[in-house]
Amino acid sequence: AFLRKAGADTALVHKFFQHDLRDTVTKMQIIQGAQTYRGSMAIALTDRPVGRAIAGQAADEMLNIAGIEASFVLFPEAGQAYLSARSGSNVNVQVISEMLGGGGNATTAGAQFPGKTTEDVLPLLKETIDNYFDDEA
């Protein structure tokens, strides 16, 4: 309504925000494989390269799941594992990512793991999440 009142072409705006079907299916497949950890963390792992943008969008989307405070997507790219992390306001994914050698900000962060697979990184991620909450207590 705001955009229409401001004179925007809402059909054009809608078209601008549409997603490619293949990318949408890929995001949904990532999300479908997600598991909860510590009750409020969603962790998804994919064994195929999906790109940083798609992984980040899947992590963003998982925050819309009731009870999820932070989300993590592990994916391979160019011979290494990558992490894309997102959160609301209760979990600082920057701190978790920095503990893993990455960075970002409180709500959007990531890390790279040269020479590692996503399966290698998964237990390390869980241990790091545990350490984060132990330090917060």
Region spans (language model):
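Hydrophobic helix-and-loop "lid/oligomerization" segment in the mid-to-C-terminal part
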Residues: A1-A137
